[in-house]
Amino acid sequence: MDRVVLPFKPRFIVYYCGSNDVNGKEGATGIVERITQFNDRVHAVLPQTRVFFVAIQRAPDKRARWAVVDSVNATLKATAARSSYITYLDLNPVLFDRTGAVRSELYKPDSLHFLPPAYVEFTAIIKPALEQAWANKR
C-alpha cells in the first residue's frame, strides 16, 4: 500500500479483495479485519479518497464457501452504509439468472475466473458509481 497506492494520492480506489482468503481457515472475521485495516489506513492517510469495495464473488468453484463469502459481504455492506467514504459494489446479481442459477457463460471452465462478457456486466455497475462520485467531487 505504501508504494503502490498512497504515494499517488488517488481520488478513488476501486478494489477487489478477499476471494482467495475464503478458502483459508481464518473465516469471515479475519477477512473483514484485513479489509477494514486497508480501508482505515487509506482514510487515515488520504481522508478525501473514496474507496469502492467490490463484493467477493459467489463463484461456482467456491460454492462450499459461499456462507463465508456472504458473511464477509454482509458485514462490509453494512460498514459501507455507515461510512462517508466507502461504497460497496455488489456484482453478484449479474452472475445469476432470474431463477438463481449461475450464468455459466460468464465463467471460464474453471468456474472461478471470468470471461470477457462478465466484465461488460461489471462495467455497467462500476462505471455509473464512479461517474456519480466524480460528478460529486467537483
Kindly give the residue locations of the regions a language model identified.
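Alpha-helical cap/lid subdomain in secreted, periplasmic
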Residues: 1-138
